[in-house]
């Protein structure tokens, strides 16, 4: 089914405007037959944040912003789905065009601006599917015009706690003015304190829903020191490393398109994000697991991210170029690598290369 979907959809979608193609892909997924997801190899199972994942490959926030197709994505073989970013009020985001393919670089630039249907609509969708199981996380953010952004996060934690498998506190999107300022030490400490307090208030009805923090790859190492210290002191359950980057390398082939404003994702982000995973892993000292994101487009890339320190990984941009078949390909490669090297579980290799990657001679 997945091969057929890719064979039919990829050539067509590449002819369309990127945002129109994305909309069509979501609609297509919703129409697929409700077949059971493929069984995962036992050695791919991961326990993290108090949750049991059948495999480590998730889909990152931004693909299914409005929780329209989480079950279809789980049937495609993802071990977990992260919907959003969701804001309390619906918002249209930034003006179009706001999504750009850099095809020769297998990259994407976006300046979407948290366009979404708003908390109430998305909550109804998740509530309607909550009995179906599967790990579905909720990525939460603040409205662009909010007068109290911390209150936006708190409200969403309280709203979605009964239906979210986990929360991701997104303070790292570059496309909402001022949002990344919430990564600064004092602001982040205040935000996480209030988010954790909100989680505790609804624990009686929702349980101990894990709270993760998603950071930018553009932090300096001194800034990362502060972020990880605060995350540990506030006892967050994990971190997602990393969001899109504002940086542009001279090696990009599509230099004209690279001048578009917004966050860059895809293959050019791989080394920067992997370095950030390793740096975060070393600083966390086992306090919490990491989800590695950024430029993963093969089993080898997934393995590198895991050996850098990621217990789980997420995909998005590579799916535009390689299709949903990439999910099974990565899982097969990871399972085969474990068998070939005599390892029983992925947890045995998490962070194995972090010291090497954080060394000065590992280029970004």
Swiss-Prot record:
It is found in: Cell membrane. Belongs to the dihydroorotate dehydrogenase family. Type 2 subfamily. It is an enzyme of class 1 (oxidoreductase). GO terms for biological process: 'de novo' pyrimidine nucleobase biosynthetic process; 'de novo' UMP biosynthetic process. The gene is pyrD. GO terms for cellular component: cytoplasm; plasma membrane. Catalyzes the conversion of dihydroorotate to orotate with quinone as electron acceptor. It comes from Rhodopseudomonas palustris (strain BisA53). It is a peripheral membrane protein. The active site is at 173 (nucleophile). Keywords: Cell membrane, Flavoprotein, FMN, Membrane, Oxidoreductase, Pyrimidine biosynthesis. Binds 1 FMN per subunit. It holds the Pfam family DHO_dh. This is Dihydroorotate dehydrogenase (quinone).
């Amino acid at each position: 089914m997945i091969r057929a979907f890719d064979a039919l959809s990829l050539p067509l979608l590449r002819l369309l405007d990127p945002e129109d193609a994305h909309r069509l892909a979501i609609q297509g997924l919703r129409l697929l037959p409700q077949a059971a997801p493929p069984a995962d190899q036992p050695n791919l199972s991961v326990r993290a944040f108090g949750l049991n994942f059948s495999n480590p490959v998730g889909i990152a926030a931004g693909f299914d912003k409005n929780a329209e197709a989480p079950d279809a994505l789980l049937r495609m073989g993802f071990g977990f789905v992260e919907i959003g970013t969701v804001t309390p009020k619906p918002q249209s985001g930034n003006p179009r065009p706001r999504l750009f393919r850099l095809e020769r670089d297998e990259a994407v630039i976006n300046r979407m601006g948290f366009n979404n249907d708003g908390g109430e609509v998305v909550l109804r969708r998740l509530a309607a599917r909550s009995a179906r199981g599967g790990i579905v996380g909720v990525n939460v953010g603040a409205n662009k015009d909010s007068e109290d952004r911390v209150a936006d996060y708190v409200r969403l934690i309280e709203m979605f706690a009964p239906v979210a498998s986990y929360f991701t506190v997104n303070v790292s999107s570059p496309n909402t003015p001022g949002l990344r300022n919430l990564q600064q030490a004092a602001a982040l400490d205040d935000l996480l304190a209030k988010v954790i307090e909100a989680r505790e208030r609804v624990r009686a009805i929702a349980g101990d829903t894990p709270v993760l923090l998603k950071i930018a790859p553009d932090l300096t190492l001194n800034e990362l020191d502060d972020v990880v210290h605060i995350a540990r002191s506030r006892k967050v359950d994990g971190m997602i490393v990393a969001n899109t980057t504002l940086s542009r390398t001279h090696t990009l082939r599509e230099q004209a398109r690279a001048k578009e404003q917004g966050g860059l994702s895809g293959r050019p982000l791989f080394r920067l994000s992997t370095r950030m995973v390793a740096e975060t892993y070393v600083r966390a000292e086992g306090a919490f697991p990491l989800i590695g994101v950024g430029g993963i487009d093969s089993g080898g890339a997934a393995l590198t991210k895991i050996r850098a320190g990621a217990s789980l990984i997420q995909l998005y941009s590579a799916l535009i170029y390689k299709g949903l078949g990439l999910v099974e390909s990565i899982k097969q490669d990871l399972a085969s690598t474990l068998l070939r090297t005599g390892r029983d579980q992925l947890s045995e290799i998490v962070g194995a290369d972090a010291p090497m990657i954080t060394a000065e001679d590992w280029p970004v």
